[in-house]
Amino acid sequence: MLKLFSAFRKNKIWDFNGGIHPPEMKTQSNGTPLRQVPLAQRFVIPLKQHIGAEGELCVSVGDKVLRGQPLTRGRGKMLPVHAPTSGTVTAIAPHSTSHPSALAELSVIIDADGEDCWIPRDGWADYRSRSREELIERIHQFGVAGLGGAGFPTGVKLQGGGDKIETLIINAAECEPYITADDRLMQDCAAQVVEGIRILAHILQPREILIGIEDNKPQAISMLRAVLADSHDISLRVIPTKYPSGGAKQLTYILTGKQVPHGGRSSDIGVLMQNVGTAYAVKRAVIDGEPITERVVTLTGEAIARPGNVWARLGTPVRHLLNDAGFCPSADQMVIMGGPLMGFTLPWLDVPVVKITNCLLAPSANELGEPQEEQSCIRCSACADACPADLLPQQLYWFSKGQQHDKATTHNIADCIECGACAWVCPSNIPLVQYFRQEKAEIAAIRQEEKRAAEAKARFEARQARLEREKAARLERHKSAAVQPAAKDKDAIAAALARVKEKQAQATQPIVIKAGERPDNSAIIAAREARKAQARAKQAELQQTNDAATVADPRKTAVEAAIARAKARKLEQQQANAEPEQQVDPRKAAVEAAIARAKARKLEQQQANAEPEEQIDPRKAAVEAAIARAKARKLEQQQQANAEPEEQVDPRKAAVEAAIARAKARKLEQQQANAEPEEQIDPRKAAVEAAIARAKARKLEQQQANAEPEEQIDPRKAAVAAAIARVQAKKAAQQKVVNED
């Protein structure tokens, strides 16, 4: 009797709240064995077929690949994908994938060569001699993921379980209508499934292993019992048929009576669950050395002539599978990927088969009934009664429709498994699952944005803290430098202090006054003379620099002198026409005359020291002399006609100006004497030029005689100009005689 009670407690099962019993419709496809599908010509392999980030590409366009060759690298939680057959990579581009919105994801497109050649396979038949880490790494690198629908990387799941797993559950319930992929796999490959379960048990080392299967699969139950006849470590549990008993939380509660905590995982209560198809893929990866390149897919529905279960290569277009099964589409034909309750309608049929594709349902127009129009909620609570997660779907519906994300989160919308039981029983035909999916996606987007904002804030605060630390360190360095000067700074400070002390000592010496003696100012006089000498030396150096930069040009000097004379004449005329009350200060005039003499001496020195860069042309000099004589005669006539008797010429100024003119004439003669005559003057040309100059002078005199005297000529300047003209004429005549000789 005690053994009976122990056996009863050992095989006890629990029941969850809610659930429904829809028509199963499994007999359409579970009566025929698994079969192979001819290879498609073109395969589209999305890089992301699992939960997590996509892997890193390791192939490029034009590469030849073999079946089982990795297309991406799996690092961390990134799961690699493998080539489903041998062929050539023709493109790596975004392509629509198996998603309700057919979103485009980066995919590798391969053209098959028809040979279907494998890569070299290295199986581990003695897997028990391998370490736990080696087995997990092999499972991960061979691309094994959860094939029950979630697509979570199996290697990551096993690694996270660690040594705290007490119960390993194999999910063989397959509760959704129409789907028979796991049922047929257990009927045809029961031994391989059990071998995969043993590999998982070797990795996790659990206390018990449970296989949960619904009682509507008698053939699969018989095959498993036959394989497990001599095994006592694996227990087969047959449970009543009820939707959704295949859910992870629901099956865990049915077999163990434990509930997964809100927001937690099954590993928190010592339970880890794997699918039947996943166990089979683990066996092929470890023992056979074959990455996951195909899976069992159910082809069913009244629009398919030959329904059944097939081995479908990953990346095969859906259209290719349906056409092989005798697909007869109607005018408004729909194709559902997954079951009728949790699946989604495909926008078109060019999407590929992926790791989580377990069923392709092509119903006829009458099979699922006419679509009903959505109506208002009547608050009947039928959805709450059917919910297996003990939620309030009607409240979640209102919160989702009203964009009340906080209230939806408070009412545990994250615990919804999207089984569709609430929508199945709703008398108002409200697609509750669609509302819940959209609401969860919006909440996830909001949380992701908040996470990015928090990370950005953390980065900003870290940067501010770093800048503050750098600023504090910089200030500390400055303070240290101010408190502790460098060695050379110490020497300079000491020298300055010594000078100050010396001056103070000198200042404190008493001044002794002796009668009859003069004070000794020799030191002060010597210092003053030294400063003057230093100033003169600096001025001389500056003068030499200016002389080197500027070389005197005789022609430019003559032009500048003429401009100066013109400006002087204009100034004198203005002074002569000015009102008599403006008197000239003799002292200022004397100062200006002295400044002018100094400038003249400086200019003469520059011209004397400058190297003559250009030679004076004698012909030009002769012409200039003739022009000067003409101008002199013109000035004399103007002076005689227009000079006012009241203006008297100062003899001293005239003498000074005459001396300046003589000095300029001597300087010009020296330049001409030092200049090497490059060209000989033709006497005939010189005579012609002189005649032309005299003609121009006479013409100018006539014009001046006829013109009304508008301007008053300064007699002193006229005298100076006449003297200069006579000197230039005499010099030109001498030069002409020298050239003729």
From Swiss-Prot:
GO cellular component, one term: plasma membrane
Positions bound to [4Fe-4S] cluster 2: C387, C416, C419, C422
The organism's place on the tree of life at top rank: Bacteria
UniProt keyword Oxidoreductase present: no
Name of this protein: Ion-translocating oxidoreductase complex subunit C
Region entry Disordered, spans: 627-654
Subunit structure: The complex is composed of six subunits: RsxA, RsxB, RsxC, RsxD, RsxE and RsxG.
HAMAP family tied to this protein: RsxC_RnfC (MF_00461)
GO biological-process terms attached to the record: electron transport chain
Protein EC: 7.-.-.-
Subcellular location field: Cell inner membrane
Membrane topology listed for this record: Peripheral membrane protein
Pfam families: Complex1_51K (PF01512), Fer4_7 (PF12838), RnfC_N (PF13375), SLBB (PF10531)
Principal location listed in the UniProt entry: membrane
MF terms in GO: 4 iron, 4 sulfur cluster binding; electron transfer activity; metal ion binding
Cofactor note: Binds 2 [4Fe-4S] clusters per subunit.
Family that this chain belongs to: Belongs to the 4Fe4S bacterial-type ferredoxin family. RnfC subfamily.
Record function comment: Part of a membrane-bound complex that couples electron transfer with translocation of ions across the membrane. Required to maintain the reduced state of SoxR.
Record-listed [4Fe-4S] cluster 1 binding positions: C377, C380, C383, C426
Cofactor requirements of the protein: [4Fe-4S] cluster
